[in-house]
Amino acid sequence: MGKLRVVHYINQFFAGIGGEEKADIAPFVAEELPPISQNLDKLLGEDAEVVATVVCGDSFFGENLETAQATVLEMVKGASPDLFIAGPAFNAGRYGVAAGAITKAVQDTLGIPAVTGMYIENPGADMYKKSVYVMSTADSAAGMRKSLPALAKFALKYAKGEEIGSPAEEGYIERGIRVNGFKEDRGAKRAVAMLVKKLKGEEFVTEYPMPVFDNVVPGRAIVNMSKAKIAIVTSGGIVPKGNPDRIESSSASKYGKYDIDGVDDLTSEGWETAHGGHDPVYANEDADRVIPVDVLRDMEKEGVIGELHRYFYSTTGNGTAVLSSKQFAKEFTQELMAAGVDAVILTSTUGTCTRCGATMVKEIERSGIPVVHICTVTPIALTVGANRIVPAIAIPHPLGDPALSPAEEKALRRKIVEKSLKALETEIEEQTVFED
């Protein structure tokens, strides 16, 4: 038997093409193996070789899920591989979602062993860990020296049909699959030993972990929108010019509260984005492309809504820990309630930003305030647990399109906001994506 043929999937950054400015690049097969694929090839040793690297921009995949997946599948199929490896994606949200999606598609559609790797908090891990093997990695490429060898070793083992051990033994993220096994000591003895450790306050590991369900009951629909006070929250990092609170561009440790009393339009002279997870140009040109202050102010004057809340809350969601996202929302939700806010419009941009946003959505809705989540990567919002979801235009400009004239763009933004208000007026019992 000859070497196993391997196809490697990576994003534009690891292909050496560029960062966010190249995130919209369509899928293609690299003419030469990029350095990361060359390293993977060496790690696979004499048993396998990387015969092709498929590259796709993170934003392109996220904004064109079906098209991108179908195109990449054809490219993978054309290389006739025996094994498919995606990533590692670490904590890059869009990359993780793309890696998980295409790994599952290759496995299910082509019947080829497929493996990926990413950080446990990557939204792609939550979405695909039950469907495919996802090797647990560090949260950044600084962990490449450990993550890539582990991914290569496990992928080879899987492709050869060898017995796969537990997550703790192999290093993949728990899949929620229970497997019967044999132990030297009978169950009663193990149970007593576990109980004794628990009573002593010592660490112990359960043999039967229970699933954690964290869905939140949808907030009640708004009965009279013309009387409702609407607040804006965003994980898209919109801040006053100069970022006075010094909110980090990634892995935020704080959020900001900003006064928009008397503000009808978020101009480039007064507002910008602190977000480091996408090209900031579009948001810096017009921050209304991320939070629709201009449209909501018009609606307030027209009597469509009762009032736009004086303050909006903002953080940068990319790479931000789930626990931090929860804590942010828990804190400012108390202020929203005290101010008599009736509903919230929450906007997000990139992949981990959407995870952060959806996490905040749930925390706000625990108070009973209904929230609508406007985002581009809707599968992440669904996976995390947002209840009312409205699809956005694009990751760097969820509520705008720079290709349109200012008047056309504002009309497009208004259409999305109108759909969002309709979502808030609609009584739901389960997660709902409000499509056109």
From Swiss-Prot:
In the first step of glycine reductase, the substrate is bound to component PB via a Schiff base intermediate. Then the PB-activated substrate is nucleophilically attacked by the selenol anion of component PA to transform it to a carboxymethylated selenoether and the respective amine. By action of component PC, acetyl phosphate is formed, leaving component PA in its oxidized state. Finally component PA becomes reduced by the thioredoxin system to start a new catalytic cycle of reductive deamination. This is Glycine reductase complex component B subunit gamma. It catalyses: acetyl phosphate + [thioredoxin]-disulfide + NH4(+) + H2O = [thioredoxin]-dithiol + glycine + phosphate + H(+). It comes from the Bacteria. NCBIfam families: gly_red_sel_B, various_sel_PB. InterPro entries: Gly_red_sel_B, Various_sel_PB. GO terms for cellular component: glycine reductase complex. Pfam families: GRDB. Keywords: Oxidoreductase, Selenocysteine. Its EC number is 1.21.4.2. Heterohexamer of two alpha, two beta and two gamma subunits. Component of the glycine reductase complex, together with components A and C. PB is substrate specific. Belongs to the GrdB/GrdF/GrdH family. One of its GO terms (molecular function) is glycine reductase activity. It is an enzyme of class 1 (oxidoreductase). Signal peptide: none annotated. The active site is at U350.
